[in-house]
A protein has these predicted regions:
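Gly/Trp-centered helix-boundary motif
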Residues: 1-126, 130-131, 138, 152, ...
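Generic hydrophobic transmembrane alpha-helix motif, especially the helices
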Residues: 89, 93, 99, 120-125, ...
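Non-cytoplasmic
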Residues: 157-161, 165, 186, 196-200, ...
Length: 326
């Protein structure tokens, strides 16, 4: 006689194991995306920057007026220092130009300066830092002493000094443009903005190059170039992304600071930068025209906050040790 009255009962451990088998493993990219989306500040900042990029990229369509177009013909009445209204959403400046339209064009120019100079400085700094950390010796000593020398002074002070020095050398200005050109400012920030990135990457390489997987790569005959490109840099991507976002912010704020002192780029009659608008805001503030201060400076602060949050989100995304739960 068989006993068929006792049902088969799954233990908790068996159920957990069965459930684990049914869960599809996430790829590294999916895990990084999940961690990034879990960072609320980065998510909101990404949306804001996405909208802002669409607006500035399509500036010819989104700007209500041309860069130097006046909101009203002077014969139709006063057009200088108009407060925000229907004809000028953010008011007008000292010669009647629409501040909203000029802000769109200015953010476009400043983002170009920031992104271009940041990419160049990160490329230079990553290359120097990786080579110095991996090879060591005299090259490492020389590069770190140069880095220490430049990092000993405030960045903006170095930029002002080197702007005057490089601008006086004809063959240099023949290559990278006049001191008032956007190309010169981008080159200036790139040439003297890589030191912090180099120190950061060097530290990462020094921490990684004695690890077992690097020793294994050397054992199978991998070259230094392959070790750097396939192992060291991929494992240093988090700090590099943080350095990139900070470099973008630094270049945008640096350009605005130079413009405030009258040393910024002069994009030309058909262009404007955010730094120029910040420079003009001081004149508006003296006359009590608050909109000339609030909107350009507010845009500068918004850019800095959003880019910083995006950098934080990227850092979390590549941090495999970060546990965000189910």
């Amino acid at each position: 006689m068989t006993d068929d009255t006792v049902p088969e009962i799954d233990t908790v451990e068996a159920l957990d194991a069965r459930e684990a088998l049914n869960v599809k493993a996430l790829t590294p990219f999916q895990m990084a995306r999940r961690r990034y989306f879990h960072h609320k500040g980065a998510l909101v900042s990404t949306v804001i920057m996405g909208v802002l990029l669409v607006v500035v990229i399509f500036a010819p369509l989104t700007a209500r007026y041309g860069i130097n177009q006046q909101v009203l013909d002077i014969s139709a009445g006063k057009n200088q220092y108009l407060s925000p209204r229907k004809v000028a959403w953010m008011g007008s400046d000292q010669i009647g130009r629409d501040l909203f339209s000029r802000l769109i064009w200015g953010i476009r120019t400043s983002l170009f300066i920031g992104v271009a100079s940041a990419i160049l400085s990160v490329i230079i700094g990553t290359t120097v830092g990786a080579v110095a950390g991996l090879r060591g010796g005299w090259f490492d000593d020389v590069m770190m002493r140069v880095t220490d020398l430049f990092l000993a002074f405030p960045f903006i002070v170095i930029i002002i000094i080197m702007r005057a020095f490089l601008g006086a050398v004809p063959w240099i200005t023949g290559i990278i443009g006049d001191v008032s050109s956007i190309r010169f400012i981008i080159a200036l920030f790139a040439i003297f903005g890589w030191m912090g990135v180099a120190r950061l990457v060097r530290g990462q390489v020094l921490a990684l190059k004695e690890r077992e997987f690097i020793e294994a790569a050397r054992a199978v005959g991998a070259s230094n170039t392959r070790i750097v490109m396939s192992h060291l840099l991929p494992n240093s991507i988090g700090p590099i992304l943080i350095a990139l976002t900070l470099s973008v912010i630094g270049a945008i704020v640096g350009e605005s600071t130079l413009s405030f002192f009258g040393l910024g780029p002069q994009p030309g009659a058909n262009a404007v930068s955010l730094g120029q608008l910040v420079e003009l805001s001081s004149e508006g503030a003296k006359q009590g025209n608050w909109w000339m201060v609030v909107y350009p400076c507010g845009a500068l602060v918004l850019l800095a906050i959003c880019i910083n949050f995006i950098g934080d989100g990227m850092r979390d995304a590549v941090d495999s040790k970060l546990d965000i739960g189910g």
